Regions:
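Active-site region of the double-stranded beta-helix
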Residues: 1-12, 24-186, 194-236
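Fe(II)/2-oxoglutarate
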Residues: 170-181, 197-297
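Conserved beta-strand-loop-short alpha-helix elements that form
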Residues: 189
Length: 297
């Protein structure tokens, strides 16, 4: 997707937004037909989809319906007619984590995640021409935007200078680093934390896939440290008197001190940065009931 990764990592990764034009067009892992199919299936449910108009998320009832099953009502199922009507009226359709249900996108995200050693999630955006889905905002991920159909005009600001920022809407995004139109077949890289916004171009319906490369942060470091503190430590749950409570406190402190004395920042960072690679042996028919039946014949 990035061609030779060395120049990209040296000059763009985490530094600047960049439009990539692969010499051989990428095969689209998903298409609008797939979107129509899953909408029509009746099984897609909030929060896997959201409809946004003029920068604001619509109420779920405006694009979903309620299903009655086993004497109960279940809300939040995508209503294809309502969704299509909102898109025709200028709203943006957002589909989250499609790697959960679309096999081609899951394989694509797995390959990218294996190459980068990171967790990769996939989001779809369908935006009418001349319309903006979201105002300027920051994402807690590096993003590769695969423009699959139509085009979008992007405005991307400089990435944060330090770690004191938050994901979400950004009222003061700072100076613009890149303003460009991304066309079908092109890939846009947006560095983690760089505020950005986009408007559907005049080429018709814009359809793009955002591959978000998740990065660990302070929260992950804390969680890993807490996991290690609890690992291999057996303490009484309810000490019965002050003396036992003090002994328990001493054991707890001694355990933590030993762990901290042996743990390095590099080891802690490596623990949260490591993402298991997809298991090739578990792929294909072995993940299906049909494959299971065949294996037992």
């Amino acid at each position: 997707m990035v061609g030779d990764p060395a120049p990209f990592l040296a000059t763009a990764w985490r530094r600047r937004a960049l439009v990539l034009r692969p010499p051989v067009p990428l095969a689209a892992p998903v298409g609008l037909v797939d979107v129509d199919t899953v909408l029509a299936s009746g099984l897609l449910r909030v929060p896997y989809l959201e409809v946004v108009a003029d920068g604001k998320a619509l109420e779920q009832s405006e694009y979903t319906s309620t299903r009655h099953l086993v004497d109960r009502n279940f809300r939040g199922y995508a209503d294809p007619d309502k969704v299509r009507g909102h898109v025709e009226s200028g709203a943006t359709l957002v589909m989250r984590n499609i790697e959960h249900w679309h096999a081609g996108t899951a394989a694509f995200a797995d390959r990218l995640g294996a190459e980068l050693g990171r967790r990769v999630e996939a989001f779809l955006f369908v935006t009418p021409p001349g319309r903006r889905g979201f105002p300027a905002h920051r994402d807690d991920a590096d993003v590769f935007v695969l423009q699959l159909q139509g085009g979008k005009r992007w405005q991307i600001h400089h990435p944060p200078a330090d770690g004191n920022w938050r994901p979400g809407p950004e009222a003061d995004p700072g100076p613009v680093q890149l303003e460009t139109t991304v066309h079908a077949g092109e890939v846009l890289y947006v560095p983690r934390g760089a505020a950005h916004s986009a408007v559907g171009h005049t080429e018709g319906l814009s359809f793009h896939l955002s591959l978000t490369v998740r990065q660990p942060g302070t929260g992950e470091l804390r969680a890993e440290l807490a996991r290690r503190f609890a690992e291999g430590l057996v303490l009484p749950l309810l000490p019965i008197d002050p003396a036992e409570l003090r002994r328990t406190a001493q054991e707890l402190l001694d355990h933590h001190r030993r762990l901290l004395a042996a743990l390095t920042p590099e080891e802690l960072c490596a623990a949260v940065e490591t993402v298991p690679r997809p298991d090739a042996d578990s792929a294909g028919d072995r993940r299906t009931l049909a494959g299971l039946a065949t294996a037992r014949d």
